[in-house]
């Protein structure tokens, strides 16, 4: 038991040190981890019809703190957990929150540390409710985000 937790922690450390995202997106990784309570609602095979209060609270915190991190969470990929992107896009509406549309993620630079003049990149002023789900099923694997989720689940035995 302790061996598994130690091995998982060591693996996480090694992968995070070698990750190209470590320096620019570590703040986002920390924020995205708080969305674990949303997995039953946004993951493929998730059984929740509505997000929990804890999920909505975490989403609100990210939107208030660094909304670009939601894009980072969707852009990162490989390890296991797959998100239903269509359902993920409805999360802000389900939580009764305003958020930039998912389509805005493509036009944004990756999250990064403050620029040379000391200012962080700005998200933009295009705030609007997330779009309603369309017919069909948009599914993509989400990896970096997935790795963090899988590791946390293993460590906390959720």
UniProtKB/Swiss-Prot annotation:
Highest taxon above the source species: Eukaryota
Propeptide position ranges: 135-158
Disulfide bonds: 28-71, 38-55, 56-95, 69-105
Record-level GO BP terms: lipid transport
Known glycosylation sites: 84
Gene Ontology cellular component annotations, sorted alphabetically: extracellular region; plasma membrane; side of membrane
Signal peptide: 1-24
GO MF annotation terms: lipid binding
Record keywords: Cell membrane, Disulfide bond, Glycoprotein, GPI-anchor, Lipoprotein, Membrane, Secreted, Signal
Keyword Lipoprotein: yes
Lipidated sites in chain (GPI-anchor amidated serine): 134
Pfam family membership, one: LTP_2
Entry comment describing in which tissues the protein is expressed: Confined to the ovaries of the inflorescence.
Protein family per UniProt: Belongs to the plant LTP family.
Full protein name: Non-specific lipid transfer protein GPI-anchored 29
